[in-house]
Amino acid sequence: MRLYDNYGIIRSEIPIVSYRSHHILFENNTMYFSISNKKIVGMEQTGYVSKIYDTGNYKLHHDYIFDSNNNILVLASEKEAKTSEDKIIMIEKDSGNITELADLIDLLPNYYSTTSLPDGAENLDWMHINSLALVDKTSLIISSRETSTIIKLDNIYSNPSIDYMIGSDHFWKESGYDSLLLNKTSDFSMQAGQHCVTYVEDNSLPQGQYYLYLYNNNLAVSTTQSDYDWKNDSNYSNTYYSLKKGTSYYYKYLVDENTRTVELVSSIPVAYSEYVSSVQELDGNVIIDSGIAMSWSEYSQDGTLLKTFKTTGGKFVYRVFKYDYLYYWFQ
């Protein structure tokens, strides 16, 4: 894991075992991050690793967050299962005990039954959940790359259920889940293959409204639904259907749970990245990583480019986030 300053100079490198560190969580002068697909550690300010959490019978992937009790919620794959990247677990922060909170097969059984294993694949990656966001203590917003859909889950600790989805009504109609979709308030091209969906409360909004922002990779592909014709889906325009050159976007949605609607309120075109990538709103600006393009940039909210960094080597820059390390390394 590499730490750069605002001038693009490497200031620190933190070694890990394997896989990747997806992002950093802070709590009580301890910094938490993954060091493999099996372990998350807590590192103190001196560099001493004081906490080690093992994911047990699961492998972590893509994202983890604190819940309202500072337990760690983790996107996971069960090690011996035939499917992958479709479960959510909780690691109790004090004990390290693991609880499976949600299995997407239980929530979307009809859709699951329509998917098929691609040629050469070892596991059925039928949802490919790639981000987590906590809402009102007991709800989660998750992102499914494989279905180009954003999903809100309620009652995650007791009896999980789907509150709504943001995606294509044509895509979901066959399996009968199209009634869960929010309605678009205007004609815009929906997110495709998105990453890093982030929940934002805003006290200026009426109750039941909030923002979601995300990296819209803008690649409409579903390897476990190979017969679906994304090109003829009227929910998409200027969207790409192969790994060739294109344009990706920062998207910001206004969600209104009262009217069950979603509105695109902001969009910034960025370097194309068919997979991976991240976006972060911070101090009035937007930090955007186009992972496959090996570049990351900072923009003002109106889309003015402030700075861009590029690097070489490796396959991609998985994610880029900006931290001030206040009260951790700096006062």
Predicted features and spans:
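Histidine-/acidic-rich catalytic cores in large beta-rich domains
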Residues: 1-331
